């Protein structure tokens, strides 16, 4: 069979062979193809008979063409090509007809298999024909094969996915059950832990109450012990003071006797020496005076003769001098003339020399015969003549020169003679002046002689008196020698004591070194433990963060699982509803079955009755009845079969309902699976695209990353599990370490306190040793005082020591520290802090022994202690508050420096100069002590070295006066005991910048205060709600006869450095607050006032209060009062009467402790207040608004023999 393409190829071949007729062939082919198409369209609508006719027609035409070709063999190529095209068109038409016939014969099943439907048969046949014509192939593909195969594959995949989903659901159910079980276990564990923690807190509370009771018992026991010890100490101190005062009195008396003896012996020796010298002088002066009188008479006569002779010689010499001067003038004139003449002769000489030279030249020329002129010879002869003349003149010149020399010699001799005469005249004038002086001296010596006679008579009388005194002194010297022997024995004992003290100081130094090394080691350990604690704390914080993240994840899982459970419960409820409906249907069906059974029973009864009736009726109705029975039995059988069918149908219905439910569930699951599979397909497509891109090298694969992340997460989860277990152990270890740390901190604080005590003791011992060495040296020096020194006597400079207090209004706001309450740290540290604070309270030793209440605060402070351990009450109040009232003020001029004279004894004044400085708010107080002789006559001697300068220092020091007051006045709380004012010495040292007991936020003075004198034991203070004891104090500047050399440590007053000790007999007192004043206070004006009282004015009442409020671990911020501040210095003499002090209110003594966090909730009342914690041995803490409007300081000078008057002044405690 040929195709249209083959015809095209043949046409193309023809075209290649003969290119010209190809256009005609193509055109003919196109026309033939169009005719063929038209024929196709027409023949589609015709019958088979018509199609055969056309075929015959085509055969006829072809036969005719063949005949023509046979006939005309000689045709041209164009004709042949045309014939071929016609033949091909016919062939094409034949093929079209064949195709049409084939399409008409195609079955409808083939069309349905090919196109999927068979309804528009003609249309489908036309499409099939056109497809065969277009493709020229028989299309035998079936449309349903591929979908069926795809459906089979889908079914298999659906079964597999269904199986997988069931497995996944089972796994999810297992995981859900496991998580629910774990959550229940965690709940149980949490409840157990909370119960245990509650039990533990209850135990801790019981332990705390028990420890509180123990502490109260210990406090009472310690208070008793301390009271007994205080009584013993006071007794011992009193005895010590008495013994020392007795020893000092003995030493002072010995020194006084020695000095008096030395002074008297020196006086006697000086007087005897003066007597002898004056007697010798008198004898020598009398003999000299006689000789001088005779010499004076002779000298007067000689002087008169010499004066007359000197006057004559003077006149003669003046005349000679006049003659010599005139002769000299004449000689000088001659000399001038001769010098002129000599100059002329010198010029002629030069001319002659020139002429001689010329003559010589001429002679040489003549000798040579050069010039034989007669003229030259004549000139030579002339020159010779002139030379002869000049030679004659030379002789005259030499004569004149000799005369001149002789004249010069004479002149020199005359001048020498005149100089000698002048010298003699000057000597005579000097001798005249000396003689006049001698006359004056003789006149003076006469007056002195008369005075010496008078003095001699006086000295004779004095010698008689001194001889009498010598006898008295000899008797006293014998007594002093006995006292010296006694004192030598005392010196030996003191030396032994000194050696013992030195050995003890060496031991103390060694102990101090060991303590320093131990403290350094402890500090290193504490630093190491702190570092480890910080590291462990950081780890704990990281782990807690991880735990929090895990808890968040668990919460998320919980929420998801709750949602799933909610969905499952909802589905279960729906299934239960369906079950109920099915049960109702089944009940209805059972009712219908029961009805049918009842009908069957009725039919059986009817049958029985019928059989009975049959037996009765007999044989009459046998035939029709048998027929009826048969019919009835058949009906019964039919009914039974129907019943069985109904039962089967009922069972089938039940099954179908169950299957329907299952199918519904499967449909839903399949829908979910289909959605999930579609998502998976999309993801797979996305992954395939990614994989393709990865293969191309464009995108990095995420599977490896996901796998790596998954592995990392698994490893992290394992690590977290291990870390959670390790954390639990570490938490216990950290609890133990915190216990150890708190114990170490407590031990470190105790060691520091002990170290400070030891340092203070060492300093006190060093001061005592220095004082003892000074006393020994002084005793040695005063024992040798009888021997006279270079100056003839030994003087002792005695310093005047005094004490006083300046009051200063310094009010501070309580520094409140609020730290954020962290849940984890509280849960880890609550028990440790409670135990550590209890241990700290138990282990602390009292550092300061100045008063009883400093070591043991009153019972009212325990109310604040009970509140302080609650963790949320972290606000601490600490700050000084001073309430002061106005002091007395007298009229004086504070602007000018005043000088006050206070008499420790009548006749020996003590000068005190007060110089205020208004710019710096300071005042300088200069005290000048009297001379040694005056001091010895007035008071006892305090032995110091002669070259030492007195240091006078005024510091604040508290005093205790138990006073009763009404309960309405005591609103500020219990008071604390104050130590009395004492004489002090300062040792300057650097204050540490950071420490437990240092105040960092305010200016501190680099002064350590050491007391020198002690006072009576402080009164016991009993605090009750009815009556509170109030401290009252009054500052005194005292000059005491006792030598107080035993210093005891006093607490450091770093609150204000207002007093500066200097070495130049001056006291610099700061007037007013040292801190910066607020604009309000500066606006009102601050005026320092210095009040100087007259001698015979009685002391007015002064009321002032003050407390030292300090906390060793807290910062203090001072705030001055907003009211007017004035400073006064009041100086009163001995004759003033004792002042009465009124009651005042002081602040509560307490110290701030570090509050400990616990989980016990606090009440609203406790939240409202701010607790103040008091601990024994710590500082004071309170907060009050300052009421001070004035500050006053009183300086009172007293004599040693004054009556025991108790004077109290306001000051800071």
Swiss-Prot record:
Gene: FILIP1
Clinical note on disease: Neuromuscular disorder, congenital, with dysmorphic facies: An autosomal recessive neuromuscular disorder characterized by multiple congenital joint contractures, hypotonia, muscle weakness, and facial dysmorphism. Patients may also exhibit motor delay, speech delay, impaired intellectual development, and abnormal brain imaging.
Subcellular location(s) per record: Cytoplasm, Cytoskeleton
Function: By acting through a filamin-A/F-actin axis, it controls the start of neocortical cell migration from the ventricular zone. May be able to induce the degradation of filamin-A.
Subunit record text: Interacts with FLNA. Interacts with RHOD (in GTP-bound form).
Outcome when changing residue 1133 to L: In NMDF; uncertain significance; results in decreased protein solubility
Organism: Homo sapiens
InterPro entries referenced in this protein's UniProt entry, alphabetically: Cortactin-Actin_Reg, Cortactin-binding_p2_N
One Pfam short name: CortBP2
Any one GO CC term of the record: glutamatergic synapse
Tissues in which the UniProt entry reports expression: Moderately expressed in adult heart and brain. Weakly expressed in lung, skeletal muscle, ovary, testis, kidney, and fetal brain, and hardly detectable in liver, pancreas, spleen, and fetal liver. Within brain, moderate expression is found in amygdala and caudate nucleus. Expressed in skin fibroblasts.
Polar residues composition-biased segments: 880-894, 960-970, 1139-1156
One GO biological process term: corpus callosum development
Family, as annotated: Belongs to the FILIP1 family.
Protein name, as recorded: Filamin-A-interacting protein 1
Low complexity composition-biased segments: 1125-1138, 1168-1179
């Amino acid at each position: 069979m040929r195709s249209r393409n083959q015809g095209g190829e043949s046409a193309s071949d023809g075209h290649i062979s003969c290119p010209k007729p190809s256009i005609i062939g193509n055109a003919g082919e196109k026309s033939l193809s169009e005719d063929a198409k038209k024929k196709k369209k027409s023949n589609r609508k015709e019958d088979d008979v018509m199609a055969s006719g056309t075929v015959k027609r085509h055969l006829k035409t072809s036969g005719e063409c063949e005949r023509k070709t046979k006939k005309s063999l000689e045709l041209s190529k164009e004709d042949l090509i045309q014939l071929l095209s016609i033949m091909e068109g016919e062939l094409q038409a034949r093929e079209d007809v064949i195709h049409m016939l084939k399409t008409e014969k195609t079955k409808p099943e083939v069309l349905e298999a090919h196109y999927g439907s068979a309804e528009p048969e003609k249309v489908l046949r036309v499409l099939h024909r056109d497809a065969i014509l277009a493709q020229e192939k028989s299309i035998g593909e079936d449309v349903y094969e591929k979908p069926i195969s795809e459906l089979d594959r889908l079914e298999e995949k659906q079964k597999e996915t269904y199986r997988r989903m069931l497995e996944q659901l089972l796994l999810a159910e297992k995981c859900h059950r496991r998580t629910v079980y774990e959550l229940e276990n965690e709940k149980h564990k949490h409840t157990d832990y909370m119960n245990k923690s509650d039990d533990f807190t209850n135990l801790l509370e019981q332990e705390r109450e028990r420890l509180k009771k123990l502490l109260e018992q210990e406090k009472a026991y310690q208070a008793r012990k301390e009271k007994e010890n205080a009584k013993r100490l006071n007794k011992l101190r009193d005895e010590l003071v008495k013994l020392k005062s007795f020893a000092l009195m003995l030493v002072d008396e010995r020194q006084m006797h020695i000095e008096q003896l030395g002074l008297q012996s020196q006086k006697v020796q000086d007087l005897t020496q003066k007597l002898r010298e004056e007697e010798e002088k008198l004898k020598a002066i009398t003999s000299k005076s006689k000789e001088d009188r005779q010499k004076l008479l002779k000298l007067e006569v000689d002087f008169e003769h010499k004066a007359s002779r000197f006057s004559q010689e003077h006149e003669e010499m003046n005349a000679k001098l006049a003659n010599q001067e005139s002769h000299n003038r004449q000689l000088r004139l001659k000399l001038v003339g001769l010098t002129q003449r000599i100059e002329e002769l010198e010029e002629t000489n030069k001319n002659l020399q020139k002429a001689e030279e010329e003559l010589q030249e001429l002679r040489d020329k003549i000798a040579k015969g050069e010039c034989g002129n007669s003229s030259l010879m004549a000139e030579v002869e002339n020159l010779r003549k002139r030379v002869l003349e000049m030679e004659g003149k030379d002789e005259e010149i030499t004569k004149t020169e000799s005369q001149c020399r002789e004249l010069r010699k004479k002149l020199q001799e005359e001048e020498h003679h005149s100089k000698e005469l002048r010298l003699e005249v000057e000597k005579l004038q000097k001798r005249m002046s000396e003689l006049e002086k001698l006359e004056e001296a003789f006149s003076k010596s006469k007056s002195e002689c008369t005075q010496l006679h008078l003095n001699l008579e006086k000295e004779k009388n004095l010698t008689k008196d001194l001889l009498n005194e010598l006898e008295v002194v000899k008797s006293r010297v014998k007594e002093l020698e006995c006292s010296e022997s006694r004192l030598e024995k005392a010196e030996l004992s003191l030396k032994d004591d000194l050696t013992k003290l030195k050995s003890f100081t060496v031991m103390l130094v060694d102990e101090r070194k060991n303590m320093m090394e131990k403290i350094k080691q402890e500090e290193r350990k504490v630093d190491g433990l702190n570092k480890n604690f910080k590291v462990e704390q950081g780890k704990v914080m990281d782990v807690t963060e991880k735990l929090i993240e895990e808890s968040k994840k668990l919460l998320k899982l919980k929420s998801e699982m709750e949602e799933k459970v909610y969905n499952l419960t909802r589905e279960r409820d729906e299934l239960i509803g369906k079950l109920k409906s099915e049960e109702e249907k089944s009940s209805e069906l059972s009712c219908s079955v029961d009805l049918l059974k009842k009908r069957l029973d009725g039919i059986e009864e009817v049958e029985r009755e019928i059989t009975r009736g049959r037996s009765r009726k007999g044989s009459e109705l046998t035939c029709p009845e048998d027929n009826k029975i048969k019919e009835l039995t058949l009906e019964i059988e039919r009914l039974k079969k129907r019943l069985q069918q109904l039962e089967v149908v009922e069972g089938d219905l039940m099954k179908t309902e169950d299957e329907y439910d299952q199918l519904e569930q499967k449909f839903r699951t399949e829908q979910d699976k289909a959605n999930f599979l579609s998502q998976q397909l999309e993801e797979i497509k996305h992954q395939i695209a990614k994989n393709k891109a990865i293969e191309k090298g464009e995108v990095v694969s995420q599977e490896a990353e996901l796998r790596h992340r998954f592995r990392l997460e698994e490893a992290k989860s394992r690590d977290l599990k291990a870390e959670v277990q390790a954390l639990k152990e570490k938490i216990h270890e950290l609890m133990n370490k915190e216990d150890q740390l708190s114990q170490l901190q407590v031990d470190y604080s105790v060691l520091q306190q002990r170290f400070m005590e030891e340092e203070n003791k060492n300093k006190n011992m060093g001061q005592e040793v220095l004082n003892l060495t000074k006393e020994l040296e002084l005793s040695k020096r005063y024992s040798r005082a009888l021997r006279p020194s270079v100056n003839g006597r030994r003087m002792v400079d005695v310093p005047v020591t005094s004490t006083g207090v300046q009051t200063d209004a310094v009010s501070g706001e309580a520094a409140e520290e609020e730290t954020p309450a962290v849940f984890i740290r509280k849960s880890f540290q609550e028990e440790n802090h409670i135990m550590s604070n209890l241990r700290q309270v138990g282990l602390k030793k009292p550092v300061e022994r100045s008063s009883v209440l400093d070591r043991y605060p009153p019972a009212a402070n325990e109310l604040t202690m009970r509140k302080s351990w609650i963790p949320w009450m972290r606000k601490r109040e600490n700050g000084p508050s001073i309430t002061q009232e106005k002091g007395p003020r007298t009229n004086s001029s504070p602007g000018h420096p005043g000088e006050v004279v206070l008499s420790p004894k009548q006749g020996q004044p003590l000068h005190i100069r007060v110089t205020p400085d208004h710019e710096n708010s300071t005042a300088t107080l200069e005290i000048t002590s009297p001379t040694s002789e005056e001091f010895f006559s007035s008071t006892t001697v305090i032995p110091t070295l002669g070259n030492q300068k007195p240091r006078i220092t005024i510091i604040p020091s508290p005093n205790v006066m138990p006073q009763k007051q009404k309960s309405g006045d005591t609103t500020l709380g219990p008071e604390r005991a104050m130590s009395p004012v004492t004489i002090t010495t300062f040792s300057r040292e650097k204050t540490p910048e950071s420490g437990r007991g240092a105040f960092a936020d305010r200016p501190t003075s680099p002064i350590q205060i050491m007391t020198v004198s002690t006072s009576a034991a402080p009164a016991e203070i009993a605090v009750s709600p009815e009556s509170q004891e109030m401290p009252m104090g009054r500052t005194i500047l005292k000059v005491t006869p006792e030598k107080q050399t035993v210093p005891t440590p006093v607490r450091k007053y770093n609150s204000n450095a207002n007093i500066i000790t200097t070495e130049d007999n001056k006291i610099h007192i700061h007037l007013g607050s040292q801190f910066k004043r607020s604009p309000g206070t500066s606006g009102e004006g601050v005026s320092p006032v210095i009040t100087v009282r007259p001698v015979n004015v009685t002391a007015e009442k002064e009321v002032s209060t003050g407390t030292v409020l300090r906390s060793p671990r807290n910062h203090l911020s001072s705030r001055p009062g907003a009211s007017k501040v004035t400073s006064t210095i009041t100086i009163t003499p001995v004759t003033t009467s004792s002042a009465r002090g009124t009651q005042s209110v002081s602040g509560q003594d307490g110290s701030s402790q570090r509050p400990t966090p616990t989980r016990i909730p606090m009440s609203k009342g406790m939240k409202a207040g701010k607790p103040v914690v008091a601990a024994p041995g710590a500082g004071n803490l309170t907060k009050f608004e300052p009421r001070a409007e004035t500050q006053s300081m009183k300086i009172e000078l007293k004599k040693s023999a004054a009556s025991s008057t108790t004077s109290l002044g306001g000051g800071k405690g």
